[in-house]
Amino acid sequence: MTQASSQRAVYWGTGRRKTAVARVRLVPGTGKIIINDRPGDQYLQYQEALLASVKGPLEILGLENSYDILVRAHGGGVHGQADAIKLGVARALCEVDPANRGPLKVEGYLKRDPRAVERKKYGLRKARKAPQYSKR
């Protein structure tokens, strides 16, 4: 047995938000973020807030320059995908070391946001908007 077999090199985490799904791989590295084969800042349209939210779980644990983040994301929009990636990174960090779970849970990084678009109902114009009521 080699040392590599006892210490895994790749950690997986899945995150979801609205209709976005992100499969996140954490690989020991220098802190690069690659989303769908593109640099993270380019994929997230150079929005610093989104990049910061993706890096959030790593920064809480002081590991921002210890792992490369490799992501396959689909569905939803840029914001939904960024939140899905954030959850996936947090779940992967829990795989790295179960002791990471406590600080991530306190900061709320392990919560899956359940809000999604409500379906349209028949007889209504939208999910809750009804046609104008006429008494006579």
Curated annotation (Swiss-Prot):
Organism: Synechococcus sp. (strain JA-2-3B'a(2-13))
HAMAP family xref list: Ribosomal_uS9_B
Keywords noted in UniProt: Ribonucleoprotein, Ribosomal protein
Example GO biological process: translation
Family designation: Belongs to the universal ribosomal protein uS9 family.
GO molecular function: RNA binding; structural constituent of ribosome
SUPFAM superfamilies associated with the record: Ribosomal protein S5 domain 2-like
Signal peptide segment: none
InterPro entries assigned: Ribosomal_Su5_D2-typ_SF (IPR020568), Ribosomal_uS9 (IPR000754), Ribosomal_uS9_bac/plastid (IPR023035), Ribosomal_uS9_CS (IPR020574), Ribsml_uS5_D2-typ_fold_subgr (IPR014721)
Gene Ontology CC terms: cytoplasm; small ribosomal subunit
Name under which the protein is recorded: Small ribosomal subunit protein uS9
